[in-house]
C-alpha cells in the first residue's frame, strides 16, 4: 500500500493541565488490529476526529468529554498550526481503520477547572466506548517518552509549545 495515496485524518487533541501544571495522561485500552496493538507505550492525551462541518475547538471539547467526562475547562492556547504524523508502513491498512496514512491534528491546551470526580473513563459518559483503562497527572516533559514511537515528534512539539503552562 502506497501511503502517498492515502489522506491524513483531520483530528484534534487536548493537553489538559491541572492547577499544578501537570497534564492528564490516559492509558489506551488494549485493542487488536489497531495502531496500538501490542504497543507497550500506550499513554496519550485525549484526541479524536473532527466531524463534518465541525469547528476544531468544538471537536476538541466534544472529544475530551466523550473520552474523559471532563467539561469544566478553560482555554489556555491553541497550537500555532496543524501537526501531522504518519503511521509506520506495517500499520498502513490496519491502523486508523485502514483509510488514512496518519493524522493531521490541531491541538488545544486547556485548564481543568473541575474536581477529579468529574473524570470518568470506565465507562465514559453517554454510553461512549472506553478509550482508556487508567489515567494520571504527569509532567508534560514526560509525555514524549510515554507515547508510541510514531507519535513522539508531535508530543515533543507539544511539550515545547505548551511549556509555559507546565509545571
Regions found by a protein language model. Give the residues of each.
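Hydrophobic (often cysteine-bearing) scaffold residues that line and stabilize catalytic clefts
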Residues: 8, 56, 151, 155
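Short amphipathic alpha-helical patches
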Residues: 31, 87-91, 159, 166-167
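Unchanged
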Residues: 48-149
